Amino acid sequence: MATDKTAFHAVSLSGGKDSTAMLLLMIERGLPIDAVLTADTGMEFPEMYEHLDKVERVLLRERGLHLTWLRHEKGFEWLMFNQPKQKEKTRQLRDKLGVPNYGNGWPGIRVRWCTGQLKTHLIEKKVNQIKQEHHALHYIGIAADERQRMKNLQYPLIDWKITEKQALQICYDRGFDWNGLYKLYHRCSCWCCPFQSIENLKTLRRHHPDLWQHLLQMDERALAQFGNTPLGHFREDWTVAQLDQRFDAEDRQMSLFEM
């Protein structure tokens, strides 16, 4: 891929396999990097934070770089339970539903406020600040077999035809293994994400019981605050408490087969 050496090169690093592979290959191929941006939701797996720390120690510091952490000043749970709703139409709709005019509730398919407020907005704001002083190029780690690219962004993995499977192997080959996180979960997004698979949630309960207990508490609070509405539903088909009962029953049944 062609590189503009006069530009300011900003790399987005989520910490996942694709963005990590992109960063590794950019460094190996001698591509310029001026900033590495990380949007922290505050709800990542502990192994992901350890991985990001390792990336900074092993890859960035010796090159005079560091992670630029981007965080919402209030955080995920404040947005979920406490953020005031100002728009009149929103307040009227909530009045009809009988829910308070604060808190976003669980993210939904149509309204993924978490991605918007905790990731996209923060990164775009930072990149726009950079663009006020520099001609900036923004690099995103999307694999060749993922969704289509957007305009005005740089997608090295697509240009290099690197698939998701290849991206993960690139990381493994260079000693970045997330302490086995990708062997447990196909995708390593926020541990509280309601869009993850049932199998992922079952794995969360088994391998991260402290996070599972936190998720139970969040869902109980959401149901109490927002009731039987989309805002109060972790998933359309299950509450976390119901999933907890289901997984417990499945584990007990499996234990009987193993006897």
Regions found by a protein language model. Give the residues of each.
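Nucleotide-activated chemistry modules centered on ATP-dependent adenylation/adenylyltransferase
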Residues: 1-259
